[in-house]
Amino acid sequence: MTNQQTEEYIYKICSIKNWKTAKQTGVFKGFGIDLIDGYIHFSSKDQVKETARLHFNGEKELLLLKVETKNLEIKWEKSRKDQLFPHLYDELPLSEIVSVFELKLDENNKHLFPSYLDD
């Protein structure tokens, strides 16, 4: 099921290693489950912290990519708990990434997110 939900920005958590590969090739192709499923998994602002907790809990050397959606064909499809998640069935041009934030861990091994996600 798809929905034409719109958000100005969506978010992708990736490793520093995957980011370095993307910078070398000029596009982000995703990794792991993205390559298996045939699309890049993203999260909305309201979903990204839960995505980190469920899929990247305690992992180091991670980045948060903030991606502008206006030039992308994003499909919103049901996933975890029937929520609609943004998916991209294409490579992500690096020009659509507006910021890269290092996700450090706090003393409890939880990721620290940028304050703009709390707005």
Kindly label every feature range from the protein language model.
Residues 2-119:
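Conserved, structured core segments of small domains
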